[in-house]
Swiss-Prot record:
Belongs to the peptidase M17 family. Binds 2 manganese ions per subunit. It comes from Wolinella succinogenes (strain ATCC 29543 / DSM 1740 / CCUG 13145 / JCM 31913 / LMG 7466 / NCTC 11488 / FDC 602W). This is Probable cytosol aminopeptidase. Keywords: Aminopeptidase, Cytoplasm, Hydrolase, Manganese, Metal-binding, Protease. Mn(2+) 2 binds at K245, D250, D268, E329. It catalyses: Release of an N-terminal amino acid, Xaa-|-Yaa-, in which Xaa is preferably Leu, but may be other amino acids including Pro although not Arg or Lys, and Yaa may be Pro. Amino acid amides and methyl esters are also readily hydrolyzed, but rates on arylamides are exceedingly low; Release of an N-terminal amino acid, preferentially leucine, but not glutamic or aspartic acids. One of its GO terms (molecular function) is metalloaminopeptidase activity. It comes from the Bacteria. The gene is pepA. Mn(2+) 1 binds at D250, D327, E329.
Length: 483
């Protein structure tokens, strides 16, 4: 989708169709030419209501407030609606107050709303829409500088490409997204964007004594891979390590999932795919930092050599783990990868994982959990997530929940002794593999809810959303500004 800006007023721009947002039922605005028809067709200007007028080839989209979140979502949904018509282009004006936040949100909405996963469809949906023409004259008559627009568009385009890469990788079925193939996808990103890339196999994992990671992979015919991407700016202001859970398929292992719960488990690689995508965007955006992306890619399957409940595993840092449930496998892979990441001596560590169903139960499908020991760091991250348009909530650690992962036979147990607080106890488990010097510099993001939703929502299509990409990039940008 091509987005172009024009300095001319909206009515002077030539396009095959028009998109007009109706803000807070302001039917008298000069851009609204068909208001006399609204009453006869039942258009009241309620939030989310749409009306297409064939005579003027105009889609009206109503929203109650002019906030970035509202503009972003409305732009995505309006784009999807217009793609159903036989138009190759449409024009739209800018809706913004003094700041350019809403312009950013509009660009993001169009770019993120344009994605659709149809790789395996014999009949692809047909849309002629290829061009969006945006007037730089706002709905309040203010003129936006074209350079400001181009800067915003370039940034949002890089972010959208990354989000859509993550979506595509997560949506890809497990047979076509094995650990080896995800590693190949990472190599392709590295080659196209001049990133450093290391792909390590079982021999490396054995050498590094990553016993937890290796145990999870044992029963799969698709061998594990540790993916390590690096973006190195010429004068980095800081060093950050991202760690992603890359379970390309999770059957639950011997603690087998029920059939209904096994469907969509291709999405258990959501954290790892987000990490790969973030590295791509970091390079495109020219972020002034040294950024490491580490993905533990494997399957969790059943078989004669599968790891078992009652096993005791030894992680890379020497800690022993009692296994009581093989379906709590992602944290085992992350444990070894987090230890590996700390050896790089970064300033901050952030892990992303579709880690717990408990997080979805507690927060719903659309919100990610943010966990860590530093209240200040969590607060800063949540602010950045809000600016990016992603929903997050603080899930606080406490000493009582920590007792629930104690083991009588090992240093720690891989699951809690009760069914409650599962997303927090999972985070506390990961904390066991974070050195004391990094406790205040580490964040755990549980993206299990929004990573894959089987319906359209916000700017997202059915399926993978690319959860984590936007908010982590926003946070990395903020860190570089502060450094």
């Amino acid at each position: 989708m091509e987005i172009l800006c024009h300095s001319a007023p909206l009515h002077e721009i030539k396009a095959e169709a028009s998109l007009i947002f109706v803000i807070n039922k302001e039917f008298s605005h000069e851009w609204i030419a068909d208001s006399e028809l609204f009453g006869s067709v039942g258009f009241e200007g309620k939030e989310g209501q749409t009306l297409f007028i064939p005579q003027s080839k105009t889609l009206y989209y109503a929203l109650d407030s002019l906030t970035p979140d509202s503009i972003r979502e409305s732009s995505a949904k309006a784009l999807r609606a217009l793609k159903k018509y036989p138009f190759s282009s449409f024009k739209v004006g800018i809706y913004t107050q003094e700041s350019l936040e809403c312009l950013e949100a509009m660009a993001a909405g169009f770019l993120l709303g344009d994605y659709n996963f149809e790789t395996y469809k014999s009949q692809k949906s047909e849309s002629k829409l290829t061009q969006i023409l945006i007037s730089l004259q706002t709905h309040l008559g203010r003129q936006i500088d074209s350079k400001s627009f181009e800067t915003i568009l370039a940034r949002q385009s890089a972010i959208a490409r990354a989000v859509n890469l993550a979506r595509e990788l997560v949506n890809t079925p497990p047979e076509d997204a094995t650990p080896q193939k995800i590693a190949q996808a990472a190599q392709k990103v590295a080659q196209e964007h001049q990133l450093e890339c290391r792909i390590e196999d079982e021999k490396f994992l054995e050498k590094e004594q990553m016993g937890a990671f290796l145990a999870v992979s044992r029963a799969s015919i698709h061998r594990p891979r540790l993916i390590h991407l690096t973006h190195q700016s010429p004068k980095p202001k800081l060093k950050v390590a991202l760690v992603g859970k890359g379970l390309t398929y999770d059957s639950g292992g011997l603690s087998l999932k029920p059939a209904d719960f096994m469907v969509t488990m291709k999405a258990d690689k959501g954290g790892g795919c987000a990490v790969i995508a973030i590295l791509q965007a970091a390079k495109e955006l020219g972020l002034e930092l040294e950024l490491h992306g580490i993905v533990g890619a494997t399957e969790n399957m059943i078989g004669g050599n599968a790891y078992k409940p009652d096993d005791v595993l030894r992680a890379k840092n020497g800690k022993t783990i009692e296994i009581r449930n093989t379906d709590a496998e992602g944290r085992l892979v992350l444990a070894d990868c987090l230890v590996y990441a700390q050896e790089l001596k970064p300033d901050y560590i952030i892990d992303l994982a579709t880690l717990t169903g408990a997080c979805v139960v507690g927060l719903g499908e659309y919100t990610s959990g943010v966990l860590g020991h530093s209240q200040e760091l969590k607060h800063r991250f949540i602010e950045c997530a809000t600016q990016s348009g992603e929903l997050t909530a603080d899930l606080p650690f406490n000493r009582h929940l920590k007792k629930l992962i104690e083991s009588k036979v090992a240093d720690v147990c891989n699951v809690s002794s009760t069914r409650y607080g599962g997303s927090i106890t999972a985070g506390l488990f990961l904390s066991e593999f974070i050195e004391e010097s990094y406790k205040e510099k580490w964040l755990h993001l549980d993206i299990a809810g929004p990573a894959y939703v089987e319906k359209e929502w916000d700017v997202n299509p059915h399926g993978a959303s690319g959860a984590g990409v936007r908010m982590v990039l926003q946070f990395l940008e903020q860190l570089t500004k502060e450094s």
